[in-house]
Design a protein with these regions (language model features):
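Conserved beta-strand scaffold positions in the cores of enzyme catalytic domains, especially
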Residues: 44, 115-117, 171, 259-261, ...
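Structural beta-sheet core signal
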Residues: 24, 70, 144, 173-174, ...
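Conserved beta-loop-beta/alpha segment of the NTase-like Rossmann-fold superfamily
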Residues: 89-92, 99-191, 225-227, 234-236
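Catalytic-core segments of class I nucleotidyltransferases/pyrophosphorylases
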Residues: 143, 162-166, 193-296
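Residues at the starts of beta-strands that form the adenosine-phosphate
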Residues: 21, 66-68, 141, 170-171, ...
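N-terminal glycine-rich phosphate-binding loop and ensuing alpha1 helix
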Residues: 15-95, 156-160
Length: 305
């Protein structure tokens, strides 16, 4: 009986640790990239030959997630079109026997991936965007990926986080160390280190002044959260910037269950800024098999002028 009980407890814990869904909040206006984003989603901006949102979905897919939930807004139809089947394009490529390109087009959304779209009616902040996905997520833990934070890691950063989620049995936020002077642009956490690069949180503050920041650990665009976060989002009052902040809901969540911060292994490109976007474009071009050699030569020639 004891053995059966232990097996059942282990199975229950494993079921609780399975992350089936990823939420992609993509309703933002993308004002930093106007006029390019006037009629198209900022998440569709390409890094070489793939849009940011595809990198994000691939990261979720490689972590074993097959249910992709997009919280969209006006002018985001291009995201739906990107992950839809392109019959005319595929037929044209098939007719010209361009099999490599045909494979690329078909691999954008594997057949075993389910993409669902829900509209955020008003731009009320990240917390509100996540709440829009509640009925689609259900009563189970889930991931959140902000596509304009391009995280380049191996294994992929979300895969690293799911391992921490399983080992620590709690919600997980990706964090990185920042210069304290930049704290006003991030959610900043405080906590106790329980393992290398893993912190059990006791506090989180949205965009604190440098003098008020509890640490130099800033949250970046990856989260693995308990479904209880939805109840806390509903109780959040508009915070910094007049929006419903996910950070405030996490601050309430960590008072009732474990929430951890994880210093991920990888490099972050802030593609919500022009400079970060350009850095990502250069770095990914330098490893792209089609253009890397010529592009590196070009960069060297530019450095001499």
């Amino acid at each position: 009986l004891l053995c059966v009980s232990l097996v059942m407890k282990r199975e229950i814990k494993m079921k609780k640790s399975v992350i089936r869904s990823a939420v992609f909040p993509v309703a933002g206006l993308g004002t930093r990239f106007l006029p390019a984003t006037k009629a198209s989603a900022k998440e569709m901006l390409p890094i070489v030959d793939k849009p940011l949102i595809q990198y994000a979905v691939e990261e979720a897919y490689e972590a074993g997630i097959r249910h992709m939930i997009f919280v969209t807004g006006r002018s985001k139809r291009s995201i739906e079109d990107h992950f839809d089947k392109a019959y005319e394009l595929e037929a044209a490529l098939e007719a010209k026997n361009k099999q490599d390109l045909l494979h690329l087009v078909r691999s954008v959304k594997p057949d075993n991936v389910d993409c669902v779209y829900i509209r955020q009616s008003e731009p009320l902040g990240l917390g509100h965007a996540v709440l829009c996905a509640e009925k689609l997520v259900g009563d189970e833990p889930f991931a959140i990926i902000l596509a304009d934070d391009l995280l380049d890691g191996y294994p992929p950063v979300l895969s690293q986080m799911l391992k921490v989620h399983e080992e620590q049995d709690g919600s997980v936020l990706a964090v990185e160390k920042i210069d304290p002077s930049r704290s006003g642009s991030y959610g900043v956490v405080s906590g106790n280190e329980v393992d290398k690069g893993i912190y059990r949180l006791n506090g989180i503050v949205e965009k604190p002044k440098p003098a008020d920041a509890p640490s130099n650990l800033a949250v970046v665009g990856r989260y693995v959260l308990s479904s209880k976060i939805f109840d806390h989002i509903r109780n959040v009052k508009p915070g910094a910037g007049g929006e419903i902040q996910l950070t405030d809901a996490i601050a309430a969540l960590l008072k009732e269950e474990p929430v951890f911060a994880y210093e991920y292994d990888g490099v972050r490109y802030d593609c919500g800024s022009k400079l970060g976007y350009l850095k990502a474009s250069v770095e990914f071009a330098l490893r792209h098999p089609e253009v890397s050699t010529e592009f590196a030569t070009y960069l060297k020639s530019r450095s001499l002028t």
